[in-house]
Amino acid sequence: MHILVVSVNYRTAPVEFREKLTFQAAELERAMTTLQNQKSVLENVIVSTCNRTEIYAVVDQLHTGRYYIKKFLADWFQLEIEEVAPYLTIFEQDGAIDHLFRVTCGLDSMVVGETQILGQIKDSFLEAQQVKATGTIFNELFKQVITLAKRAHSETTIGESAMSVSYAAVELGKKIFGELTDCHVLILGAGKMGELALQNLYGSGARKVTVMNRTLSKAEVMAEKYMGHAKSLSELQCALLEADILISSTGASEYVITKEMMTKVEKMRSGRPLFMVDIAVPRDIDPAIDELEGSFLYDIDDLQGVVEANRAERLKEAEKIQFMIEEEIVLFKTWLSTLGVVPLISALRDKALAIQSETMVSLERKIPNLSDREKKVISKHTKSIINQLLKDPILVAKEIAAEEGASEKLALFAKIFDLETEEVESRAEEVEHKRVWTPSVPSL
């Protein structure tokens, strides 16, 4: 089995391509279920954010797995593999494990050290579990990754000086307008990104705020927190007439603001400029609007320069986290290496329990007057003896599994205990196809 990551991210693909490969939240479970049925894919988790779409997979063959994951992406988004391939980055084995740790800890983010990605990874993992797309390997790996990411942020200061994309959008507005107190601000979208932007705007002095959302009740709840006003998206054109600053993050599949709409609005704005930041992927605002004289449009890739602030300080903290990651990878690989011994241990336990069961049957024949309570006590104590006898051999087997030449040593181990090869192989199949174990994931 092999661990594989297929990634489209802000480093390798511009926003105009990333938006073509973005999974909507409502379709993520269906996508993971579909991918799980692809040839070679044993486990999978799909992560899709404004800066990356990544498929994490356990595959039985690297070459076959790579091909069918690429094919899945192309088919899902109705593109040709040749269109998708140039923008893909592929990580395998240790590189894939390291990449997952780095992404979850915020080391691979546009804003190094940001914490939002940790929640996004956790949500994707839990959704994958719900549709039974994860198994033994990813249940352990993602549990370990999420735990380390929390520890990394609590034991270092990397997140203290990191700004979110939403914060960067507000900072860009402040550079252009200076004080925001008298600016009319329009927020499109009442999701996490929109609320983060509004929170930062409010902290920067903005008080003339309007929140718009397809569901008016969500806009009302968000606006009330920050003394703003809520409006339905049906009133968008009127709201654009009043706004000085627009920050959009609706997550719609089509443009919310078109060039045609903005052309009409500009004619009625009497030459007043409108500063627009589109932090949605797919984009909410038609990029052709930037051609208009009075509209100044920035997308998420344009914020790169803004988020460079305090980068040197955060990179020092990132080095500490990378060291923590490397230690954790060693622990995971040690655990992974012991998976091969699980069938052997199971076969050993089964054989011992079979002997105990046969002994109990023989004992009950020889002493037929035993009460049910006496039978339970004898059974419990004989099982306890078995567990004590097996404890040391099992520990030794696990240690052997992590050593070089483990297969030959484990074969000798099986021979000593006279374990049938077929029985061990049968147990190995059970472990490989196990899909039911669900770990407790630490809350964020």
From Swiss-Prot:
It catalyses: (S)-4-amino-5-oxopentanoate + tRNA(Glu) + NADP(+) = L-glutamyl-tRNA(Glu) + NADPH + H(+). It is an enzyme of class 1 (oxidoreductase). Keywords: NADP, Oxidoreductase, Porphyrin biosynthesis. The active site is at C50. The keyword Transport does not apply. InterPro entries: 4pyrrol_synth_GluRdtase, 4pyrrol_synth_GluRdtase_dimer, 4pyrrol_synth_GluRdtase_N, GluRdtase_CS, GluRdtase_dimer_dom_sf, GluRdtase_N_sf, NAD(P)-bd_dom_sf, Shikm_DH/Glu-tRNA_Rdtase. One of its GO terms (biological process) is protoporphyrinogen IX biosynthetic process. The record marks H99 as: Important for activity. Possesses an unusual extended V-shaped dimeric structure with each monomer consisting of three distinct domains arranged along a curved 'spinal' alpha-helix. The N-terminal catalytic domain specifically recognizes the glutamate moiety of the substrate. The second domain is the NADPH-binding domain, and the third C-terminal domain is responsible for dimerization. PANTHER family: GLUTAMYL-TRNA REDUCTASE 1, CHLOROPLASTIC. During catalysis, the active site Cys acts as a nucleophile attacking the alpha-carbonyl group of tRNA-bound glutamate with the formation of a thioester intermediate between enzyme and glutamate, and the concomitant release of tRNA(Glu). The thioester intermediate is finally reduced by direct hydride transfer from NADPH, to form the product GSA. Catalyzes the NADPH-dependent reduction of glutamyl-tRNA(Glu) to glutamate 1-semialdehyde (GSA). This is Glutamyl-tRNA reductase. It comes from Bacillus cereus (strain B4264). The gene is hemA.
